[in-house]
Amino acid sequence: MSQVILDLQLACENHAGLPDEAQFQRWLDGVIPQFQEEAEVTIRLVDEAESHDLNLTYRGKDKPTNVLSFPFEAPAGIEMPLLGDLIICRQVVEQEAQEQSKPLEAHWAHMVVHGSLHLLGYDHIDDDEAEEMESLETEIMLAMGYEDPYIAEKIAE
């Protein structure tokens, strides 16, 4: 049986309207057990200032972003179930959901799925990688009862 341990950190000022720990756990459980049996993931919910600082420091991008993924790399020869950390910016997620006319809960779920896939080694730097990752995200989101997060982009093409 797979086990995903969640460490949820609420580092944003306003906690009203945030998904609860059970929702974050459900979203992680919808992704990670497909790839590995045990994992520990920290999800830290932050405000724009912290997201901006981290995005500038680690990605060279001078703005807040929706989700940042920091995979854990154990020292050679040591096996640990730590998968890594997801930093999710509340304001960016809420703004994107509104701009993209997506249900807020679905967009939160998508950020957890997207970030988890990054922790598992997936990326979207080139077109082939992006296509594979988006396909996995869509499959996982549909399995959890949400719409395809990329449906608007597919319709626009």
Curated annotation (Swiss-Prot):
It is an enzyme of class 3 (hydrolase). Zn(2+) binds at residues 114, 118, 124. Transmembrane segments: none annotated. Its EC number is 3.1.-.-. GO terms for molecular function: metalloendopeptidase activity; RNA endonuclease activity; zinc ion binding. It comes from the Bacteria. It is found in: Cytoplasm. Belongs to the endoribonuclease YbeY family. PANTHER family: ENDORIBONUCLEASE YBEY, CHLOROPLASTIC. This is Endoribonuclease YbeY. Binds 1 zinc ion. Its cofactor is Zn(2+). Keywords: Cytoplasm, Endonuclease, Hydrolase, Metal-binding, Nuclease, Ribosome biogenesis, rRNA processing, Zinc. GO terms for biological process: rRNA processing. GO terms for cellular component: cytoplasm. Single strand-specific metallo-endoribonuclease involved in late-stage 70S ribosome quality control and in maturation of the 3' terminus of the 16S rRNA.
